[in-house]
Amino acid sequence: MDGLHPASWMLLLGSLAFWSASSLLLFSLALPGARASNQLLSECHNGKGKGINCSELTVRESEVRVCDESSCKYGGVCKEEGDVLKCICQFQCQTNYAPVCGSNGDTYQNECFLRRSACKQQKDITVVARGPCFSDIASGSGEGEYEGSGGEVHKKHSKCGVCKFGAECDEDAGDVGCVCNIDCSGHNFNPVCATDGSSYSNPCLVREASCLRQEQIDVKHIRSCIETDETSIMGKKDEGLQNRPEVKDSTDQREGDFMGNYIPCSENYNGYCVHGKCELSYSSQKASCRCDSGYTGQYCDKTDFNILYVVPSRQKLTHVLIAAIIGAVQIAIIVAIVMCITRKCPKNNRGRRQKQNLGHFSSDTSSRMV
């Protein structure tokens, strides 16, 4: 190094200065481009990049994308796994059935399931109504979480205006109006107290009254509002029958479409009724329980202790009859054995006495003959 010529030193220092200046120049030129690229990427990601070719940024997005507020919204948690970003939706939703209608037209089991679906889809979904979304034809949707979708949300608009709470517009009749095709004749006696302060014989009559009055009436609690006031239950039922609009004849051409007012619930409602059968109203798309004998409650989960006797089903009745016949035969056999034993004992005693008398008689006669 000491032997280098001064000219060589000058050449070496000049080269180092040139490379340093070139590096600084390239860095200063690249910095505004990087800032502009990040700004364009942010605008494209937030949907504000109008007029910008965002397709060219798809490759670079994976290189610079990080977890921020826009990466995972609606209650999700953003997590980086290597070069991949994942949005984790940790919602511990309870399984209670409190249906809500979402802004996307889907019915969710409860509000928690709606928020979880919004997180998974990264879409803004809000509650538009409490209760299921009413639709003419239900169809499956997204995640299958007790959902059903339809084009109309919660109300049906027609020539009648707005038919709510399960009512249908009868446009074929001369007097166009809302008709309630709700048949509660097949429901067991399961008294409930409604939010209007009246008692009804079963929840079906509550839905019928809500449909007839076109106002919101729900089940407040199980059993009548005043347990001893049985007349209020029957009076409410008679009142509903008197004010009930005329229902079209069962030979209506729409009978094939309805196939009855109630249809069996889908597999999504498994376990909804504890001791009973789940039925879905075709018009209102609301689930209800037809409780087995001896059970009551909205979900047939309470034992009805007021019932004096329980009428068994056809299969159980057959078993009861067979058991009764077998028991009767056993009782008859036992009675016959007892009667046979009690009758043999006196005969044996009389036989022994006759033999003793004959013995005495023979000895007396023999002595007399001698």
Curated annotation (Swiss-Prot):
Topological region Cytoplasmic: 342-370
Every Kazal-like domain range: 88-135, 179-227
Signal peptide: 1-36
Glycan-carrying positions: N53
Disulfide bonds: C89-C119, C93-C112, C101-C133, C180-C211, C184-C204, C193-C225, C265-C278, C273-C289, C291-C300
GO CC entries: plasma membrane
Domain of life: Eukaryota
InterPro entries xrefs: EGF-like_dom, Kazal_dom, Kazal_dom_sf
Membrane topology: Single-pass type I membrane protein
SUPFAM superfamilies recorded: EGF/Laminin (SSF57196), Kazal-type serine protease inhibitors (SSF100895)
Expression sites (tissue/organ): Expressed at highest levels in brain, and at lower levels in neuroendocrine tissues. Present in neurons from the diencephalon (at protein level).
Transmembrane segments: 321-341
Site location (Reactive bond): T95, N96, G186, H187
Tagged with keyword Ubl conjugation: no
Pfam families: Kazal_2 (PF07648)
Residue ranges annotated as Extracellular topological domain: 37-320
Complex formation: Interacts with cripto.
Function: Inhibits nodal/nr-1 and bmp signaling during neural patterning through interaction with cripto.
Similarity-based family: Belongs to the tomoregulin family.
Protein name, as recorded: Tomoregulin-1
Naturally occurring in which organism (per UniProt): Xenopus laevis
